[in-house]
A protein has these predicted regions:
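ER/Golgi luminal nucleotide-sugar-dependent glycosyltransferases, focusing on the catalytic module
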Residues: 1-301
Length: 301
């Protein structure tokens, strides 16, 4: 297949750039000859010299300063979704707050719901809205939705290894659902992947019925349920888990603080994730083949 024009999307935040940006640019943007989009929240103190922001060809910015607890975003997203009713179906979505899993000691279920689940689904909705508004989907063949706090142990697989008819997810960190930290999509499966919030609004009774029977839902389980409802879960395929999330010594986080590494000088947010990435790096180093040959063997359908 000829070169597939690729857009990499950094979702929600551009944190940890001082540790990750050079690694990201080399192993993702340069490796894939890709363009960058940032779809993020900004406050008054946001640093517009952030290298993720300055490199981005497309910038979709949500004003968090005016909506620090994201309460306004619920009605904003609902009003900008074509729902054939005057009823506030988003209230069913907010009832999820008592069904989501949290590792924090915060007794405020709504706050835990925000940081574990809602913010991610909202920014997927915000991304989808802007991609349609500015007709970005028609300009690219492939779309990689990811995050800025990743360090890559290996270059990202070239798109020729990832058949566009499938949804490609790293092979790990599923937590009884499906990993939500990176997704490689194409035009035909972009919408059924990202329209989680829209589906909760349009199919509120069905989605709430799916989740009301148990507690401790997490984002990974919600994503899997959503893909099943959209009849695209059978399209999910896996590629090697080659990156891991970090946090700088004084960096902020909405969720997992991580374990500090004295050797590396930063927090490893999910130690098992780092171990998986290192495992794949070691497999490549022992293989004595090119990175393309390594992925051709490692990625099977």
């Amino acid at each position: 297949m000829n070169h597939q024009k690729t857009l990499v999307i950094i979702l929600s935040e551009t944190r940890c750039h001082e540790l990750t940006f050079d690694n990201f640019k080399k192993n993702v943007i340069d490796e894939l000859s890709a363009d960058l989009c940032v779809c993020i929240g900004v406050k008054n103190d946001y640093d517009y010299n952030n290298p993720y922001y300055t490199l981005a060809k497309h910038r979709f910015l949500y004003n968090e300063e005016d909506d620090k607890n994201f309460a306004k975003s619920v009605e904003y997203s609902y009003k900008n979704t074509e729902v054939a009713s005057d009823q506030k179906h988003y209230l069913y979505f907010l009832m999820l707050k008592d069904r989501v899993f949290t590792e924090t000691s915060n007794p405020d279920s709504f706050t835990n719901f925000l940081i574990s689940t809602y913010i991610h689904t909202f920014f997927l909705w915000f991304l989808h809205r802007n991609m349609k508004k500015f007709r970005i989907l028609e300009k690219y063949d492939r779309f990689i939705i990811s995050r800025s706090d990743y360090l890559y142990k290996l270059p990202f697989p070239k798109m020729k290894h990832l058949d566009p008819k499938y949804i490609w997810i790293p092979n790990g960190e599923d937590y009884f659902g499906i990993c939500d930290r990176t997704a490689v999509l194409s035009r035909q499966n972009f919408e059924p992947y990202v329209n989680i919030l829209e589906s909760f609004y349009k199919k509120s009774n069905k989605y709430y019925k799916n989740i009301e029977s148990k507690k401790n839902w997490n984002m990974e389980q919600i994503l899997k349920m959503h893909l099943e409802e959209n009849n695209v879960f059978p399209l999910v395929q896996r590629y090697p888990y080659i990156s891991y999330c970090i946090r700088s010594k004084n960096g902020t986080t909405r969720w997992e603080a991580g374990k500090f590494s004295e050797k590396l000088g930063y927090f490893i947010k999910y130690p098992k994730e780092e171990q998986q990435a290192t495992h794949h790096e070691n497999d490549f180093l022992k293989s004595c083949v090119s990175i393309d040959e390594f992925y051709a063997e490692a990625i099977k359908i």
